[in-house]
């Protein structure tokens, strides 16, 4: 009888600690943010691509390009989405910022490449992760930004801007 009570107490304690730990883990996951900072000179170009979520480009200071991104979701897996920043072009002077969903091979100045994964990628019914990207751009940097399912806002640009959105 005593071992039954001890076992029941152990099970109850384990369940209680699991219930208490779950909100803390979920809260930590919801802060899935990304930060990157690097140099970009006037006359070079920023390329930003997002499939599901907004892109906001703002005037920055100095010669630093600052990228922040935050993942939002209800039922999807945020680990299936990663933010990638690459420096390309002459002397690696241009910068490409992409949100890559599982099942995509790559992204460059021209956008996304590779096959989509209908079961697990953004297109599937299992992943509702959206990415909110904010980029601070120095004066004189050309901007090319596109989102499939989200807004593209550019404020304070002092060079050429190409902004596209399919549904946003």
Regions from the PLM with identified roles:
Residues 1-7:
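Positively charged n-region of N-terminal signal peptides that target proteins for export
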Residues 7-18:
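Bacterial N-terminal signal peptides
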């Amino acid at each position: 009888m005593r071992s039954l009570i001890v076992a029941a107490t152990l099970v109850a304690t384990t369940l209680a600690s699991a219930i208490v730990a779950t909100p803390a883990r979920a809260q930590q996951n919801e802060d899935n943010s990304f930060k990157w900072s690097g140099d970009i000179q006037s006359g070079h170009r920023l390329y930003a691509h997002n499939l599901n979520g907004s892109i906001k480009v703002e005037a920055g200071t100095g010669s630093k390009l600052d990228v922040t991104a935050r993942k939002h979701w209800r039922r999807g897996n945020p680990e299936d989405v990663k933010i990638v920043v690459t420096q390309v072009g002459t002397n690696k002077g241009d910068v490409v910022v992409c949100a890559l969903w599982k099942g995509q091979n790559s992204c460059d100045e021209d956008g996304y490449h590779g096959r989509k994964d209908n079961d697990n990628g953004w297109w599937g019914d299992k992943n509702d992760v959206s990415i909110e990207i904010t980029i601070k751009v120095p004066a004189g940097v050309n901007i090319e930004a596109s989102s499939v399912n989200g807004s593209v806002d550019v404020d304070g640009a002092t060079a050429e801007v190409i902004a596209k959105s399919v549904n946003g």
